[in-house]
Amino acid sequence: MIDESTIKQAVGLLQQAAPGSSIIVFGSCARGEITADSDLDVMVFEPTVTSRHEEMVRLRKVLRPLGIPADVLVASKDTFEYWSDTPNTIYYEVAREGRVFDAALP
């Protein structure tokens, strides 16, 4: 099961793999509603990414050693800022409940 220590380990691994990025944990882990079925939902804001899909796959692989289910999304700060006030988007959810684990705020 995911706990606070696991979340911090995951964030540390992502910070090493994507220097200069902002990392926000959202979903049940951010709300403090972790259960045995929870996964770790993370949004990573990177300054420049050639392929968001390839980067999401790469960052998921970075978390494999933790042995937890994880959903890693990659976005630009511009996209986040544009959609964060629009209900029924993932960006809206992240803006409302996300926990920022990096000083470079989106």
Over which residues does each language-model region extend?
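Catalytic core of pol beta-like nucleotidyltransferases
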Residues: 1-22, 30-36, 47-106
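Acidic Asp/Glu-based divalent-cation binding sites
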Residues: 39-41
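Short hydrophobic/aromatic beta-strand micro-patches
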Residues: 43-45
